[in-house]
Amino acid sequence: MWVSHFLQLLARVLVGAYPRWVGSAPNHNQRIYIANHTSHIDTVAIWAALPEHLQKHTHTVAAWDYWANNKFKRWLTTNGLNAVYIKRSKEDANGEDPLQPLYDTLASGESLIIFPEGTRNKGEVPQPFKSGIYHLAKRFPHVEFIPVYLENLSRIMPKGEFWPVPLACTARFGKPFYLQEGEDKDDFLERARQGVISARAPHVASN
């Protein structure tokens, strides 16, 4: 749809959104892309970095209370970013599993883009991950996890700012991984986090 092409063009003009497939290839394997989260433009940057043939079968995960709280936002994210929504509060979810829309999407053979930190982070190193991706991995152990490190977006459009600084963003796609047999939640979440950190360019210093 034209709105998707417009958002991608805007992302490329403003931040670059250059893809670097450093540990994986842009193939048709079903995947869950997990990335560090530093700004509102992160989702568009990853979306723009994916080839169009993968976008058709990939869905961005969006918070219902923020991205679907008015008709325009919902139209924009549904038609522009192929969004699937999760209801984070018990009141919105009406007692249902908030991950059910993601289970349904994966069960249909589609892929997801998700930010496991759950909130934006000012630092270059991701915060500890929320448990949602562990539950996805347990239910769909055959689905690849692809760590993605968004480089420079914390400086291009930091939390609290509304206009980007003119720097180039790179989306670095790292090595695929799966939930290992017998691996517990904490170990998996930390391994996933380290996968995102490892996808960074070598010159980026560790914390």
Which residues are covered by each model-predicted region?
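Helix-to-loop junction immediately C-terminal to a conserved catalytic motif
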Residues: 5-37
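N-terminal/domain-start segments enriched in small and hydrophobic, helix-friendly residues
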Residues: 25, 42, 48, 68-69, ...
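Short hydrophobic helices that act as membrane-entry/anchoring signals
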Residues: 1-16, 74-78, 82
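Glycine-rich, highly charged phosphate/nucleotide-binding loops
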Residues: 14-19, 90-99
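Catalytic core of membrane glycerolipid acyltransferases/transacylases, capturing the structured
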Residues: 27-90
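A structural micro-motif
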Residues: 17, 56-58, 110, 143
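Short beta-alpha junction loops
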Residues: 63-67, 118, 149-154
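A cross-family acyltransferase "interaction/gating" segment
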Residues: 75, 111, 122-186
